């Protein structure tokens, strides 16, 4: 049953599953539930488990489901709360005249500029909140530009054959997949720079691979006199139920790794695996309540991670 809690919570809830409902168990934490209406009272439900399946669906529909649920119609989110008028206006002013997609860096920088103009205290926000606001606003920017550019590309067009149609569709899907990861990387890099933390994005470490970030940089990594506990090898994963293991083979000089993620919860068993592998999870504070309650104290938020890094680097130079 779907129930509207308007007075207190201002949200819908799915209720009355019963104690023997097969999906009410800890192993399903972080999965994606998709409901497709057949009629007003009859829905088809899909539960997606693997990262690849979740990202494939989101890319195909042109949606992103981090932080909250959403209702989508014709690929456009129908939000319960109205969009901020200032953000909406600046999005249109920034990209209304674009005939093609700008670079990922331009998207990210523009999103932050919009927030700086529309939110009086944006520069004072904690890193966790600044990260989530920036990612959400950039997603709005991307949606607007995609409609402007791709609508002209496909609306009313007669494709000469199936291959041309598939090629066009794949181009749109691949752009959506790549954009989310680049957005995440760009905003994390900005936060590190703002915090004054030296770092290198995607350094080439030879046989030790190419991690997403190394702190303070390659020179310190290859300097065997530099203390290992003052080195940080970081993986950036928008989803990490499976992909967190990739960081284990990167920057192998550093045994204790960090993974920064937007993953909305994973199981206690997976968190035990991470702990055994000496991988610390860094999750924006607003997403901590998506994780098993007994594991939440073990999670780092972005602010805590930045503080920890700065303290360790400061002791290395003293």
Locations of the language-model features?
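Charged, structured surface patches that assemble and position nucleic-acid processing machinery
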Residues: 1-11, 26-44, 48-76, 271-318
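Acidic-basic catalytic patches of nuclease active cores, encompassing PD-(D/E)XK
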Residues: 161-209
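Glycine- and charge-enriched low-complexity intrinsically disordered segments
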Residues: 66-116
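Catalytic core segments in nucleotide and nucleic-acid processing enzymes
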Residues: 189, 199-318
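Interdomain/boundary linker segments immediately adjacent to catalytic/signaling cores
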Residues: 94-182
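Short, glycine/acidic-rich beta->alpha junctions
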Residues: 25, 141, 145, 155, ...
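Catalytic micro-motifs at enzyme active sites that drive phosphoryl/nucleotidyl and oxygen chemistry
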Residues: 18-24, 33-34, 201-203
